[in-house]
Amino acid sequence: MKKIFSISMLFLVTFSFGQKLFIVKSDEKFGLINESGIEVIPPKYNFIEDFDKVHPNWAKVQLENLFGFVDKTGKIVVEAKYESIGNYNEYNQGWALIKKDGKLGFINESGKEVVPPVYDKVGNFGEYAKDWASVESQGMKGFITTDGNIIVPLKYSSIEKFDGIRKNWALVKDKKDKLGFIDKSGKEIIPVMYDSIEAFTKKKTSAVSTEKKTEVATAD
């Protein structure tokens, strides 16, 4: 067994069969030993958080300013490669927000990346539509779903809330400042080609205009 110098210990957790784990510190690094003094995790981490605080049976660890997770056997379940890892279930059930190279994504409860960290901003699920979250990259916006798929491509410079002008529709604008609508299936129901769009009336029509002409769009 490796000898550990300058050890400080803090009771962490008890297994179902009664085994206790302790945080140990050596040369400003943290690890875990069991009650027999055997290393479960060698002291190599800058920080070890309490087990079960973020994820059942896991502890968040920090290694050279990057974060990951280990389990109670000392196994690395999520490599310490993220700049930050948020709390589970904060955005979506069973997901935790991650940040890598300045970009955002999500991991699930098994530690798998269900949404790769490629986004500059991520919104809350349900803010625009049920099971959708807004995402943004390089100033362009779209939506992902709770299964991790992109339902609206990131091609709009702005997306208004649904139902603001017409029920179940959201006004969108592209990088050329052209306007159109998407519906709650993610379909572009009115092409993004207009310079202005006025509100729908009780007759379910709206005036839309380009630089050359004005037309009337009809809501089904």
Where are the model-predicted features located?
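Bacterial Sec-dependent N-terminal signal peptides
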Residues: 1-21
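Residue-level detector of conserved, function-critical positions
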Residues: 19-220
